[in-house]
């Protein structure tokens, strides 16, 4: 990559980070302006268009990055699990670390999931579906259950995890610890339920064939 291309990539990165830094519990992406983001990134507003067509394209890039960040962290969690960690507890801890270190990235996913922009809703739905698919792959490999079971289990788990994540954004350390414990319990219940439901279906199938 040439010097000019490197500089362009650094500026693009600065714009993305500037936009993330301006999000907060009180401020959504929809309230950001091109001028504010450009000023925070240290460039002229007219230079913004060398990197993104408009603010919406910047936002969609941020959604993609947020989803990718989360999936990469959860892959790392699965590597830690392979070395002997508790599957559910390690996954919950990793997810909470993501929220703690990237609260605005998670806020973006939460808000735009049900926002007014169809393009943003579709982008977040796509990222969540990627997350569900990767988890279903892992469950299928580890639990040796059919895809239909692992997809249903993964979807239920992701729904509960995202709901808990929304609560974690606004609580203190002790409340967060309690939420983590509750989430671990809920995920274990889903996991046990999926296993016993599958076993029951297998028993019914065996009886029908007898």
Curated annotation (Swiss-Prot):
<dbReference type="GO" id="GO:0006633">
    <property type="term" value="P:fatty acid biosynthetic process"/>
</dbReference>
<keyword id="KW-0444">Lipid biosynthesis</keyword>
<keyword id="KW-0276">Fatty acid metabolism</keyword>
<comment type="subunit">
    <text>Homodimer.</text>
</comment>
<keyword id="KW-0963">Cytoplasm</keyword>
<dbReference type="GO" id="GO:0045717">
    <property type="term" value="P:negative regulation of fatty acid biosynthetic process"/>
</dbReference>
<keyword id="KW-0678">Repressor</keyword>
<dbReference type="GO" id="GO:0003677">
    <property type="term" value="F:DNA binding"/>
</dbReference>
<dbReference type="Pfam" id="PF21943">
    <property type="entry name" value="TetR_C_46"/>
</dbReference>
<dbReference type="Pfam" id="PF00440">
    <property type="entry name" value="TetR_N"/>
</dbReference>
<keyword id="KW-0805">Transcription regulation</keyword>
<dbReference type="InterPro" id="IPR009057">
    <property type="entry name" value="Homeodomain-like_sf"/>
</dbReference>
<dbReference type="GO" id="GO:0003700">
    <property type="term" value="F:DNA-binding transcription factor activity"/>
</dbReference>
<keyword id="KW-0443">Lipid metabolism</keyword>
<dbReference type="InterPro" id="IPR050692">
    <property type="entry name" value="HTH_transcr_repressor_FabR"/>
</dbReference>
<dbReference type="InterPro" id="IPR001647">
    <property type="entry name" value="HTH_TetR"/>
</dbReference>
<comment type="function">
    <text>Represses the transcription of fabB, involved in unsaturated fatty acid (UFA) biosynthesis. By controlling UFA production, FabR directly influences the physical properties of the membrane bilayer.</text>
</comment>
<feature type="DNA-binding region" description="H-T-H motif">
    <location>
        <begin position="33"/>
        <end position="52"/>
    </location>
</feature>
<keyword id="KW-0804">Transcription</keyword>
<dbReference type="InterPro" id="IPR023764">
    <property type="entry name" value="Tscrpt_reg_HTH_FabR"/>
</dbReference>
<feature type="domain" description="HTH tetR-type">
    <location>
        <begin position="10"/>
        <end position="70"/>
    </location>
</feature>
<dbReference type="InterPro" id="IPR054129">
    <property type="entry name" value="DesT_TetR_C"/>
</dbReference>
<keyword id="KW-0275">Fatty acid biosynthesis</keyword>
<dbReference type="GO" id="GO:0005737">
    <property type="term" value="C:cytoplasm"/>
</dbReference>
<keyword id="KW-0238">DNA-binding</keyword>
<protein>
    <recommendedName>
        <fullName>HTH-type transcriptional repressor FabR</fullName>
    </recommendedName>
</protein>
């Amino acid at each position: 990559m040439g010097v000019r291309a490197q500089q362009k990539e650094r500026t693009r990165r600065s714009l993305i980070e500037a936009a993330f830094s301006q999000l907060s519990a009180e401020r959504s992406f929809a309230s950001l302006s091109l001028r504010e983001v450009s000023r925070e990134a240290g460039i002229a507003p007219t230079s913004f268009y060398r990197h993104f067509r408009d603010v919406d394209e910047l936002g969609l890039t941020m959604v993609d990055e947020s989803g990718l960040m989360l999936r990469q962290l959860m892959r790392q969690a699965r590597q830690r699990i392979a070395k002997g960690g508790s599957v559910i507890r390690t996954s919950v801890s990793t997810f909470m670390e993501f929220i703690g270190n990237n609260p605005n990235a998670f806020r973006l996913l939460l808000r735009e999931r049900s926002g007014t922009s169809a393009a943003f809703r579709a982008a977040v739905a796509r990222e969540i579906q990627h997350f569900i698919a990767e988890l279903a792959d892992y469950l299928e490999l580890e639990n040796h259950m059919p895809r239909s079971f692992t997809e249903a289990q993964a979807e239920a788990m992701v729904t509960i995890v995202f709901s808990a994540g929304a609560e974690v954004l606004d609580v203190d350390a002790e409340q967060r610890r309690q939420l983590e414990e509750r989430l671990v319990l809920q995920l274990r219940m889903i996991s046990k339920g999926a296993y016993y439901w599958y076993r029951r279906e297998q028993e019914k199938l065996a009886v029908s064939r007898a």
